[in-house]
């Protein structure tokens, strides 16, 4: 743990190299004194690394010097020390500190920009946070001193002072830093009294401080963090390897590098708390594998993120050195001797062009200094190799199809997304040269086996259902499978107590159905189900009626059906024997009917039984008896009078005389059961029976009455 006036930071082991020099040392020129020098790697405009011929990341050094004879005269130079062994010192660029702006972007990345147009920028990458913080402290102090002297000189000469340059932190006083160091030592040693004295002294100075535990307080092993990623329309789960001592800001950079979500659009929530960038994961309770964090993504417009800024930051993130997690792990595992190796930045650049290095080295000379335009030319020399290294042909494309819902890359033969179960795009086809791996072949085999088992189970179920239906069809009555209420008597029927009608699946109790059968005048017994909006028009089957009623009632129902069939048949003839139920359907070529019931011979021409006489003899005998029988004559005259006066009519089907006593204009013939419209003296329905409007009186068709005097013929 370390403490400075600029803020608490995680302490790194002291650098064993001689790359950082504090104090005063002689410079190459006799008129300047070097204040500090530090090794860096350079990125121009935050996009591509500064590629110098023959100069690796370890050969570039930032140097801050001052002129002792002139107050506020500071020079910031970028040197190439790769040619030091040959006795040459190459100054790549040198700036007057009053003409630049210096900004701390991240703990390991600083940016230098010109105060005057074209405002060119150079970004520096440092090896460790401790070196970068010490360098920033010295540079910021020198920068403020240079500006103060410039403002004083401008005031004395009557000129307006230049506008203030952007700085990142206030200049720490030496005494404050000493107290911070003493406080760190006292806390690490457990000296409560000394720590209290130092804390009181800092409180009296009102020093701006921030505290953060050192990495040594955390475990060195990575943990697997379960991250639930959500935006306004979708969500998914990913796993991220992190260290508990990592900050939220470092986690945002890691997600940016791995998944492309810019830190500005990331909102982290851990333990129902909105996370701050400077706090560590351990402070939010992340300690072991499986701990959960929530990442909410906002829109780029809401985060005020433009496409140019995103591309610039993305390219910078791809070329940045690895995180301090890996360097810390290597330093802890290998000891202090491995610190230089652990803190050495990795390079993603291709191999340098040695011929370009030799040419530029010869042209540069020992002490030649380059401007920003020359630096840009040096960068352009390495662009072909850099573009080749970052080209798309170097990237291996994973075979498969991308899920349109969650964008997961699935294997070509998979029919649905492995993550969200979405269907595979219809236009996708499996490549012809694709060969599935062992796991995919196993999955395909398991799918085939699952389909086979499903088809087998479905076939077994079909056979069981068919057997159940065959067994049920052999029963005359189908019992109700579950508890139900009879819609006639409203009695609750347990399973098996009621009867489920085959035609309509309506359920009633046996007693109610038996009563409906016995009370029905029509041989076709209709289903008794009725409600406010529906009347069932299905009928009971013959075997259902046979199973519900007794044998005598069943025979009576059959006889009733025969009677109705006889009356509705046009060519029917009933046996003339009294109380004989026999009847027949005659044809034109047949003149006699031998009744199978009473064994009598009926004459179909005379409609009578005249055994021993022919038809002529029977007609003469009938005429003679009618003349002498006054009762028969009076009956005949009365019926003719009723028909002529309109009080009676002949049935349009069988011709017998029917009479309406009272009520509506609908009546039914007692012989043939034909429905008759009294006002029109014709049949109510067409030849197909009830409901046929192709004939009959057509009453209420198109909302029109059949006759102006119609009194509801139904």
Curated annotation (Swiss-Prot):
Zn(2+) 1 binds at residues 486, 489, 509, 512. GO terms for molecular function: ubiquitin binding; ubiquitin-protein transferase activity; zinc ion binding. Gene3D superfamilies: 1.20.120.1750, Phosphatidylinositol 3-kinase Catalytic Subunit, Chain A, domain 1 (3.10.20.90), Pleckstrin-homology domain (PH domain)/Phosphotyrosine-binding domain (PTB) (2.30.29.30), Zinc/RING finger domain, C3HC4 (zinc finger) (3.30.40.10), Zn-finger domain of Sec23/24 (2.30.30.380). A zinc finger (IBR-type) spans 555-615. A zinc finger (RanBP2-type) spans 394-426. Keywords: Metal-binding, Repeat, Transferase, Ubl conjugation pathway, Zinc, Zinc-finger. PROSITE patterns: TRIAD, ZF_RANBP2_1, ZF_RANBP2_2, ZF_RING_1, ZF_RING_2. InterPro entries: BRcat_RBR_HOIL1 (IPR047558), HOIL1_RBR_mRING-HC-C3HC3D (IPR047559), LUBAC_E3_Ligases (IPR051628), PH-like_dom_sf (IPR011993), Rcat_RBR_HOIL1 (IPR047557), Sharpin_PH (IPR031912), TRIAD_supradom (IPR044066), Ubiquitin-like_domsf (IPR029071). The active site is at 664. A zinc finger (RING-type) spans 486-536, 651-680. It catalyses: [E2 ubiquitin-conjugating enzyme]-S-ubiquitinyl-L-cysteine + [acceptor protein]-L-lysine = [E2 ubiquitin-conjugating enzyme]-L-cysteine + [acceptor protein]-N(6)-ubiquitinyl-L-lysine. It is an enzyme of class 2 (transferase). Zn(2+) 3 binds at residues 575, 580, 595, 598. Belongs to the RBR family. This is RanBP-type and C3HC4-type zinc finger-containing protein 1. It comes from Danio rerio (Zebrafish). The gene is rbck1.
């Amino acid at each position: 743990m370390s403490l400075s006036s600029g803020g608490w930071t995680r302490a790194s082991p002291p650098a064993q190299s001689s790359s950082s020099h504090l104090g005063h040392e002689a410079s190459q020129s006799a008129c300047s004194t070097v204040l500090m020098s530090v090794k860096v790697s350079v990125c121009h405009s935050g996009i591509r690394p500064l590629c110098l011929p023959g100069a690796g990341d370890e050969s570039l050094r930032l140097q801050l010097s001052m002129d002792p004879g002139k107050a506020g005269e500071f020079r910031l130079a970028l040197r190439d020390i790769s040619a030091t062994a040959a006795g040459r010192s190459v100054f790549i660029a040198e700036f007057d500190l009053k003409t630049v702006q210096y900004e701390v972007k991240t703990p390991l990345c600083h940016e230098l920009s010109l105060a005057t147009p074209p405002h060119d920028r150079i970004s520096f990458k440092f090896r460790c946070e401790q070196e970068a913080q010490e360098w920033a402290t010295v540079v910021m102090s020198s920068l403020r001193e240079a500006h103060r002297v410039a403002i004083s000189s401008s005031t004395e000469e009557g000129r307006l002072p230049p506008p203030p340059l952007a700085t990142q932190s206030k200049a720490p006083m030496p005494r404050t830093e000493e107290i911070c160091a003493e406080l760190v030592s006292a806390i690490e040693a457990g000296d409560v009294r000394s720590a209290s004295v130092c804390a009181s002294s800092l409180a009296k100075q009102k020093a701006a401080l921030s505290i953060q535990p050192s990495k040594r307080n955390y475990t060195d092993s990575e943990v697997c963090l379960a991250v639930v990623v959500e935006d306004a329309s979708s969500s998914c789960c990913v796993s991220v390897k992190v260290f508990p001592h990592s900050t939220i800001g470092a986690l945002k950079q890691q997600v940016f590098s791995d998944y492309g979500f810019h830190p500005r659009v990331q909102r982290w929530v851990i333990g129902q708390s909105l996370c701050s960038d400077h706090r560590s994961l351990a402070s939010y309770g992340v300690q072991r594998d499986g701990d959960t964090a929530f990442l909410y993504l906002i829109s780029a417009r809401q985060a005020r993120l433009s496409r140019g800024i995103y591309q610039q930051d993305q390219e910078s993130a791809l070329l940045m050195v690895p995180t301090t997690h890996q360097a810390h792990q290597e330093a802890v595992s290998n000891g202090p001797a491995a610190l230089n190796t652990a803190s050495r930045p990795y390079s993603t650049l291709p191999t340098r062009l040695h011929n370009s290095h030799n040419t530029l080295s010869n042209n540069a000379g020992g002490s030649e200094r380059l401007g920003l335009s020359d630096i840009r030319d040096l960068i352009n020399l390495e662009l072909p190799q850099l573009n080749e290294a970052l080209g798309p042909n170097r990237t291996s494309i994973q075979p498969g199809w991308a899920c349109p819902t969650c964008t997961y890359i699935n294997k070509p033969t998979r029919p649905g997304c492995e993550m969200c179960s979405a269907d595979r795009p219809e236009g996708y086809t499996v490549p012809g040269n694709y060969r599935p791996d062992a796991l995919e072949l196993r999955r395909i085999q398991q799918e085939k086996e699952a389909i086979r088992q499903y088809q087998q189970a479905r076939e077994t179920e079909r056979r069981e259902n068919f057997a159940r239906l065959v067994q049920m069809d052999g029963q005359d009555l189908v019992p109700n499978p579950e508890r139900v209420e009879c819609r006639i008597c409203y009695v609750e029927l347990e399973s098996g107590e009621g009867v489920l009608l085959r035609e309509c699946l309506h359920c009633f109790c046996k007693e109610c159905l038996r009563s409906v059968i016995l009370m029905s005048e029509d041989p076709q017994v209709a289903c008794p189900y009725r409600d406010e909006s529906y009347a069932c028009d299905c009928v009971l089957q013959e075997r259902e009626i046979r199973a519900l009623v007794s044998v005598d009632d069943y025979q009576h129902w059959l006889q009733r059906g025969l009677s109705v069939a006889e009356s509705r048949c046009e060519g029917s003839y009933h046996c003339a024997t009294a109380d004989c139920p026999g009847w027949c359907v005659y044809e034109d070529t047949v003149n006699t009917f031998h009744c199978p019931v009473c064994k009598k011979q009926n004459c179909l021409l005379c409609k009578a039984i005249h055994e021993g006489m022919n038809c002529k003899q029977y007609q003469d005998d009938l005429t003679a008896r009618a003349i002498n029988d006054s009762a028969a004559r009076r009956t005949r005259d009365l019926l003719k009078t009723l028909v002529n006066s309109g009080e009676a009519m002949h049935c349009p089907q069988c011709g017998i005389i029917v009479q309406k006593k009272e009520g509506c204009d609908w009546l039914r013939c007692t012989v043939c059961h034909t429905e008759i419209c009294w006002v029109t003296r014709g049949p109510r329905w067409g030849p197909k029976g009830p409901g046929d409007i192709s004939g009959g009186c057509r009453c209420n068709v198109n909302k029109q009455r059949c006759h102006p005097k119609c009194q509801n013929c139904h």
